[in-house]
Regions:
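N-terminal ligand-binding lobe of clamshell/alpha-beta domains
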Residues: 1-128
Length: 128
């Protein structure tokens, strides 16, 4: 999947929300590792936990270029104070994954290649 992505993908700073609590996919998670292999930058790179609970203000300050989230968590994410001012949200640079896609993304195992393709398709849509 990574071989099909444009070089501009490497400049994309991405936030992946795995749960509305909110928990994000850190660099040490299988999701974060997949994102790195695809060439994008994880805004949670410095987080020591695989799936850290995130302070919403951290994401607001980080100003990711792209946000990946499940469709079912999208509404609550968009209602967070200040998030409507984020460029990624104002410019609709969001990938909202259907429940079946989200299920593939958040479960490690034999479908990890499929998860990589789902993420790669999202990245392709927003790389210039």
């Amino acid at each position: 999947a990574a071989q099909q992505l444009p070089v501009s993908t490497q400049q994309l700073r991405v936030y992946i929300e795995v749960n509305r609590a909110p928990f994000g996919a850190g660099a040490r998670s299988f999701i974060g590792e997949t994102l790195t292999r695809l060439g994008a930058q994880n805004i949670l790179q410095a987080q020591p936990d695989a799936f850290p609970r995130i302070n919403p203000e951290f994401v607001l300050r980080a100003q990711p270029d792209l946000i990946m989230v499940s469709e079912r968590d999208m509404t609550s994410m968009l209602e967070r104070p200040g998030w409507s001012s984020m460029a990624a949200i104002k410019n609709n640079r969001l990938c909202a994954f259907a429940p079946a896609e989200q299920d593939v993304l958040v479960r490690p195992g034999p479908r990890l290649a499929e998860a990589a393709h789902i993420m790669a398709n999202c990245l392709k849509r927003f790389s210039s």
